[in-house]
């Protein structure tokens, strides 16, 4: 089915045969249902993954869904929100809350796509840094009744709170092979809230995306609804910035370890006492196991709200 016909007249993109761009019927119906219900103080979260692989077209599909959401909001409520790379796409987790607040205060029923630069390359490392930022974003910006799209390579890298309870669906993208052994993008499997919960529970250990059956599967066309060249340039710039940010984060972590070491050795404080004092002074949740893992170099365990 073609959607957003008024925004994409003939000549809007290469090989266009009719106004609008193609969207799978059931996917469109799902978005329409959310658009209908958003007025009753709901917000929605879509996770788009790529079976742990890269270059499968996740970003293109995410932008198409965001574009159609914006179009459908306009048609149903008469609210014409902006839809631009600057306002609606986030490349760094550190920008989520800032952009989310700005969008929520500026627009009603807006849409934000988190398409983190470098996530495809860094995998678990990238997601572990982003998880707390995503949680903080949902805490602060959940009241804005927005559509939020998390575009990530690996669904199973998410903590269970986001993967199962805080999101409405999973759209997993994959590559197929045609009759000439050529790889083709443009296919997805859609998991509803109950289905993705089963997938996470049964598939996480082996990262098995076929641990349970999807609700439906479909296709999308390789149509950029935002300027492709500008998008690629912004993402490349975001990658360069990310390298600088990562070095700063590593330096801060070394400072933190040094401070904890001084508290242990010079002041003879236990991890429990350090956690208690941090909690009291900073008014935040603090756990002794965090400091234990920090100093031993172990991976932080996922903590769900």
Model-flagged regions — what are they?
Residues 1-41:
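N-terminal pre-Walker A segment at the start of P-loop NTPase domains
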Residues 67-87:
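Post-Walker A helix-loop "phosphate-sensing" segment adjacent to the P-loop in P-loop NTPases
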Residues 39-45, 263-280:
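Short, charged amphipathic recognition helices of the HTH superfamily
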Residues 250-269, 302:
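Short, amphipathic alpha-helical "recognition" segments used to contact nucleic acids or chromatin
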Residues 85-148:
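Conserved nucleotide-sensing/catalytic segment adjacent to the nucleotide-binding pocket
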Residues 45-70:
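Glycine-rich phosphate-binding P-loop
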Residues 270-272, 276-296:
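Short, basic interhelical loop/turn and adjoining N-cap
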